[in-house]
Every structure is written in C-alpha cells, then in structure tokens.
C-alpha cells in the first residue's frame, strides 16, 4: 500500500502555513510516493479560483523539492492548468493526469509534455466515444487505469460503489479500443501495471530520507 497526499482543489481555500506543514509531514512518510490530488476544478469551484491556483503552484514546487510525482485533478480547467505546469516546470519524478474524461484535443498537449494519464470507468460508458478515441492514441508508456473509487463504476457495474477490483473492466475496455488481442492484450496489461509501479511503487526519495 502506498500513499498520495495533497490538498485537493476543492479545499484550496484552506492552504496556508499550517496546511503546508501538515502536508510536508505526510510527504516525509516513506510510504508516500506521490503528491496529489492537486490542481484546478472549475466545475464545482468550491474554492475561489485564485486560491486554487495558489495552492496548486505551491504544491507543484513542493513536489519538485521532494522529488515526488504529482497527481493532477483537472476539471474544466485544462488550459489554465497546463499553463501553470509549463510556468512552474514539470517535476522530474513525473506527472499523472488523473481520471481523464475529455477528448484527444484536450489531452494531446499533456501527452506531448510527457505526462502520464489514467482512465477510469467512464471509458466504458455509452457516451464515452471521445474518451475512447483519446485512450486509443496515448503512447503505451504513458497509460494507466484507475477506479476513482467510490465513484464511476464501469459497465456492467454502473450504479455500484466502485472499488479497485473493478479496474479490470476498464483495462479490458482499454485493450478493446486499442485493438489489442491475444499476446498483445496481455502485453498491454503488463505495461499498464509496470507504468503504475514505476511511478508509484518507488523507493523513498533523498528528501524523504533527509539527505
């Protein structure tokens, strides 16, 4: 079991010295392998957008200092988030665009920047053609799947509380949209697992070890 810790954009209005101190303490835990979810959410706007940007920028800087990858929650804000990442600089440890549900035109500049992307149950939905088209185009080395638990259960389990075991349905749909069959299908499953392990099942960083 590994840990991701970060201040979600919904709660960005609470960013301040005390919150940063608590986050840094969590990141020093050697089980922590990622800083996230962080980013921008313009759909709900539960925190003012200026607070979202302030917290986002601060946490990207901390991730770079700590040598950890970032996991990004971006909703209806991909252009602004991309501009911020370009301005702050991409963490060398990597970047994961969490639970992508948009089209290839939105995703392409993130892929070009080297960001990995995860697809959840929405990949299986009837109205998910644009998501499937995007998933078919992503280079294999940048692909992952996830659950977004407890939300977004994939077909045929829509309406249930999502759980990690359900990722197999999303992974199967991913193989389908990429036309992978037989050994190619198994190789894709192995690659998706390897991508996740290499990014998230990482040894402690020098920063975490106090070096």
Predicted features along the sequence, with ranges:
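Conserved, mostly hydrophobic/aromatic
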Residues: 3, 37, 63, 98, ...
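Active-site environment of divalent metal-dependent phosphoester hydrolases
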Residues: 10-12, 41-43, 75-82, 101-108, ...
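Distinct, well-ordered alpha-helical segments
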Residues: 16, 23-24, 74-89, 96-97, ...
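Short helix-capping segments at alpha-helix termini
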Residues: 31, 65, 87-93, 113, ...
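Short acidic/histidine-rich active-site segments
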Residues: 141-163
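Mid-to-C-terminal alpha-helical segments outside catalytic/metal-binding sites
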Residues: 62, 167-211
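Active-site gating/metal-coordination segments in enzymes
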Residues: 1-69, 113-116, 121-126
């Amino acid at each position: 079991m590994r840990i991701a810790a970060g201040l979600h954009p919904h709660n960005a209005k609470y960013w301040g010295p005390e919150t940063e101190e608590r986050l840094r303490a969590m990141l020093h835990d050697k089980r922590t392998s990622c800083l996230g979810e962080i980013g921008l959410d313009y759909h709900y706007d539960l925190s003012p957008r200026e607070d979202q940007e302030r917290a986002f920028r601060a946490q990207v800087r901390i991730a770079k200092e700590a040598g950890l990858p970032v996991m990004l929650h971006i909703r209806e804000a991909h252009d602004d988030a991309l501009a911020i990442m370009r301005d702050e600089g991409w963490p060398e440890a990597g970047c994961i665009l969490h639970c992508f549900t948009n089209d290839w035109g939105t995703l392409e500049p993130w892929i070009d920047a080297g960001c990995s992307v995860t697809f959840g149950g929405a990949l299986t939905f009837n109205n998910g053609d644009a998501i499937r088209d995007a998933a078919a185009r992503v280079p294999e080395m940048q692909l992952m799947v996830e659950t977004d638990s407890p939300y977004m259960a994939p077909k045929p389990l829509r309406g249930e509380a999502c759980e990690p075991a359900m990722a197999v349905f999303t992974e199967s749909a991913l193989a389908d949209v990429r036309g992978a069959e037989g050994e190619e299908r198994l190789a894709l499953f192995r690659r998706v697992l390897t991508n996740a392990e290499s990014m998230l099942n990482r040894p402690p960083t020098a920063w975490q070890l106090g070096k």
